[in-house]
Amino acid sequence: MVLINQLGAVLAVCATLTVAAPTKGKARFNVPQVAIPKKMVHHPAVSYARALHKFGMKVPKTVQDAAKGSVPTTPTPSDEQYVTQVTVGEGKLNLDLDTGSGDLQGHNLYKPTSNSKRLNGYSWQISYGDMSSAGGDVFLDTVSIGDVTASSQAVESAKKVSDQFAKDKATDGLMGLSFSVLNTVQPKPQTTFLDTVLSQLEKPLFTCTLKHGEPGSYDFGYIDDAKHSGEITYTQVDNSEGWWGFTADSYSIGGPNTTSFRGDSSGMANGGSISGIADTGTTLMLLSDDVVGEYYGQVQGATNDQQQGGYIFPCDAQLPDFTLSIGGYNAVVPGKFMNYQEIDGSMCFGGLQSSGSSGGPNIFGDVFLKSQFVVWDTQGPRIGFAPQA
């Protein structure tokens, strides 16, 4: 870890909103994402390690070792992170909107102003599976996104940061859109951005339209019917632990009518249901060993490579589609989305990896979410899916 004064800056992130600014009527607004440089400076196993650690799963030594490596060739462009501009105090930060976090955390310049207020005795600390970490003090400041402003936001100002965070120039941090129970500010957790601004929104929901290979967008307070085709299928959310958790009735590899379809003809669970967490802050999709092994068993040349820290395959391999059946709706992830990143000129790292042998949670990250139009509705709560228009 490097003390922040040695870096010549105060790194920060916004964690939680406690007071929403008054508004006339109800707000609805669109927030476009910002394109970030596509050239990656770390091994793809870093994304894998961070995802495992984020959800309390053991990070195998092989993954840790691979995450410390580098990619010697210019990699194929990948959708590692999606960022959105958020005004924090007097500055603008490019943040990853993260439904798997209750904080707003980051690693870019933050300067408390005369309007900022330190929360004495409050602190924060985060770490990830690739050994990156940051921590520091908490201030109250103004945070705005779109047409909504929180006038008293808990801003996590970093006093120390590891080299991994200091070298990450692609994004400035993350804004949590989970339920407030996940907030990590101590000694008293704060409300999330989403929970704070709900009263300002026309409807207590937001949607995301993540894209493959290009920026997408978030809409707050309304559903833009021009962004999806067909009806939206909803399913109940389990938020008992703060996550946007849901259960898919069944899955299939190669299509819902293939022999690997798990479930009966009605689409109801028959030993093939998959419960997991929808998380825009996780790049990959993580499923159980048997499902992942079954998928790559249909990919010629695929192998679980210990040196690379996960499943890899020839970059020109034909990858089958992966389908989740949710309330009678088939959410299809095109096979090409499963090709996450080139690692050595001929082999590629998979966008689907194992959630571990210890029974860790399944994670429906961006590899899955960018194939769908998704509604995150706090009433219920529930989550909805439809094909993107």
UniProtKB/Swiss-Prot annotation:
The protein, known as: Aspartic protease pepA
Compartmental location: Secreted
Any matching Pfam family: Asp
Propeptide residues according to the Swiss-Prot or TrEMBL record: 21-67
SS bond partners: C315-C348
Function: Secreted aspartic endopeptidase that allows assimilation of proteinaceous substrates. The scissile peptide bond is attacked by a nucleophilic water molecule activated by two aspartic residues in the active site. Shows a broad primary substrate specificity. Favors hydrophobic residues at the P1 and P1' positions.
Listed EC numbers: 3.4.23.-
Organism for this UniProt entry: Arthroderma otae (strain ATCC MYA-4605 / CBS 113480)
Carbohydrate-modified residues: N257
